[in-house]
Amino acid sequence: MLKIITRQLFARLNRHLPYRLVHRDPLPGAQTAVNATIPPSLSERCLKVAAMEQETLWRVFDTHPEGLNAAEVTRAREKHGENRLPAQKPSPWWVHLWVCYRNPFNILLTILGGISYATEDLFAAGVIALMVGISTLLNFVQEARSTKAADALKAMVSNTATVLRVINENGENAWLELPIDQLVPGDIIKLAAGDMIPADLRIIQARDLFVAQASLTGESLPVEKVAATREPRQNNPLECDTLCFMGTNVVSGTAQAVVMATGAGTWFGQLAGRVSEQDNEQNAFQKGISRVSMLLIRFMLVMAPVVLIINGYTKGDWWEAALFALSVAVGLTPEMLPMIVTSTLARGAVKLSKQKVIVKHLDAIQNFGAMDILCTDKTGTLTQDKIVLENHTDISGKPSEHVLHCAWLNSHYQTGLKNLLDTAVLEGVDETAARQLSGRWQKIDEIPFDFERRRMSVVVAEDSNVHQLVCKGALQEILNVCTQVRHNGDIVPLDDNMLRRVKRVTDTLNRQGLRVVAVATKYLPAREGDYQRIDESDLILEGYIAFLDPPKETTAPALKALKASGITVKILTGDSELVAAKVCHEVGLDAGDVIIGSDIEGLSDDALAALAARTTLFARLTPMHKERIVTLLKREGHVVGFMGDGINDAPALRAADIGISVDGAVDIAREAADIILLEKSLMVLEEGVIEGRRTFSNMLKYIKMTASSNFGNVFSVLVASAFLPFLPMLPLHLLIQNLLYDVSQVAIPFDNVDEEQIQKPQRWNPADLGRFMVFFGPISSIFDILTFCLMWWVFHANTPETQTLFQSGWFVVGLLSQTLIVHMIRTRRLPFIQSRAAWPLMAMTLLVMVVGVSLPFSPLASYLQLQALPLSYFPWLIAILVGYMTLTQLVKGFYSRRYGWQ
């Protein structure tokens, strides 16, 4: 029974945390594993559109091949709305206010308030109502601010689509980069490798277009999409080869398409409107919050009944005992936790944005601080984001203009995703030569790049009788489809001797830190029709183009800073192991034994996990290799970050605890990431890690303070309840004490953090929290018991008639010691001298202490059932507080030496 109640309470707590802020959004479509019903009308409409001729498409969608003009766009948007999913639309303010109220802590307070009102204790009911109001409003305001900050940050890195629009009254059109929420049905858009499908589309032109639909269909392999259907009698819209759906992504190829549905009208939009709850795997932050919350709630559920039984049995007044036990339960619940978490994360996100780090999901900040392994690609991270074409040689290593011109034709005429290598090739040919080449050779066709083949081809023609296929790509993949080489002007077979020559030349280039790309050609009789991958066979190896990818000046100090921060950096690259090892050496990273992709193919998960733990450099990896390595490192208990910006990085970005990409990354990589860097630099990343640790430390302060003081208070209550003939403190006193303490905690997100607390990864550790409670909780109990003795024997408050004096004395000691513990526990150093809190926290705690001491002397004292304390009480109060702080400091020194300090 206890387990069921605990689970239900925690479920309510977890729902209370701002879901959209501390849960990573699944890729659009990823949640459709939940069975949901699609309206038959939508399926029928999709099937009709899939089979339509282009002329019919223009008519049905009120569009035309030139694109929509401004007036047509306005009409379409008025009819269909913005291209946003239902779940992305903000809820009304009153819904947010209700969500902020309905947490187990406020419900407990409300029950207690109702009981107080029913027993005509109106003042207590008013105080409880004030507590509920403050807790709810603070959380509401902080969540609203956090939501606004998160939305503003997300808007800075929103995805775009390439759209054909009419741009003036003369009917001139142009391809424009527009945010995807501006798309309307009838728009014509262009797709390329790496693009997210921004709406439901009907393909009108396609070139080797392959789309990953696993998020919708579960099919792991990409499927080809075409402009004219090959299966006219298809019954399942998701299997129609002329349709693409929102939430899927382009793996390879290019296309043009007409937008047939946006927002709620899309296939995924219909699913999102019908799916109310999805199972989301918790990341490291969410698991930590879950474990800590469960620990505190279980402690509350165990101790409150114990307090009830002891007080009811010893005092005989079970009704009063029940009220007191319920007040103790309220005092044991960390009702400010949601607000502290939300405001701390939001403040960290805003600070990071000023350091060129955009946080898409607020919990990523804490994961930043917890990260102990960073896996990253080499290009643009360790190296400069500018690649220089250094050599263009034949197979013997001699400079060759012919090889350069072949590479230029390939880079110039390909329409897929142009990378830094293509840019370097295009810049490596002067304008005169480029004009001559483009005038002499006409493009016939292309075979786009994909990560399975790791090469791409264009087909060009100089005359009408012969076509030339020009292929460039990774050396081994090019060699796999070559049977001949061009050697000293002659075409000779690619035999073992030639292969050894090729390896010798390319290894020499690799050792110089040059990245080698092979170039091959093939002459074919002119023909009609498309060229396919099968045509990439029996090629002639022409030579190589070699690129210099020099390390950044900031890489070495950034790696040193990351190492000093307790983060292990691992390089996961698709590049050659020789090039990667050279770069690692130049930046001071000890690569050790290098593991290549083919080495891990046959390894079991356990063997690869052990290998991954001790290996720094992995080379020649596929996207699935990267994902598998990241997943296994997580399985071993590490908090893993992955930094990448390409299509091949998306699976690993998604698998990591924290996915990190850059503003210039492809759509699918940015969508999969939790954090976007406006500057692709490890130094910026290191600053983010430090901010994450500051954020975590401030959150942990609240939990440690609350847990330890609550533990001590309960122990004190149990002792007092067992031996006193009256309640040690009235339920109302506990509530006021709790309210004042909560007010003092509001400033924790603004507190300073000691340098030593941000020098290593910070992890949630419920076991450490339990140990912390056991060590520090009894300290307050010791001085509470001394206070009991003081009030009983020195001030003779030992009868029911003098219980108000007793309760007033413990009220002041309890509140001041509970407030001072904030300063004692926030640092492992000597508080106020070696480490001072930020001024907001100093001011709030001082204010609460002044209010606490003043209440027994105020006009409210009689209403609160407190009384003025004699002046002789205050020297004893100072002695108790000094003794309390001294013992806490001594225990803190022992604890930090024995167990460390978070």
UniProtKB/Swiss-Prot annotation:
Extracellular topological segments: 120, 313-321, 720-728, 795-803, 856-870
Coiled-coil residue spans: none
Gene Ontology molecular function: any one: P-type magnesium transporter activity
One GO cellular component, as annotated: intracellular membrane-bounded organelle
Entry annotated with the keyword Magnesium: yes
Membrane topology classification: Multi-pass membrane protein
Domain of life: Bacteria
Keyword Translocase: yes
InterPro entries recorded: ATPase_P-typ_cation-transptr_C (IPR006068), ATPase_P-typ_cation-transptr_N (IPR004014), ATPase_P-typ_cyto_dom_N (IPR023299), ATPase_P-typ_P_site (IPR018303), ATPase_P-typ_TM_dom_sf (IPR023298), ATPase_P-typ_transduc_dom_A_sf (IPR008250), HAD-like_sf (IPR036412), HAD_sf (IPR023214)
Pfam families registered for this protein in UniProt: Cation_ATPase_C (PF00689), Cation_ATPase_N (PF00690), E1-E2_ATPase (PF00122), Hydrolase (PF00702)
Protein name, entry field: Magnesium-transporting ATPase, P-type 1
Lineage: Bacteria, Pseudomonadati, Pseudomonadota, Gammaproteobacteria, Enterobacterales
Gene: mgtA
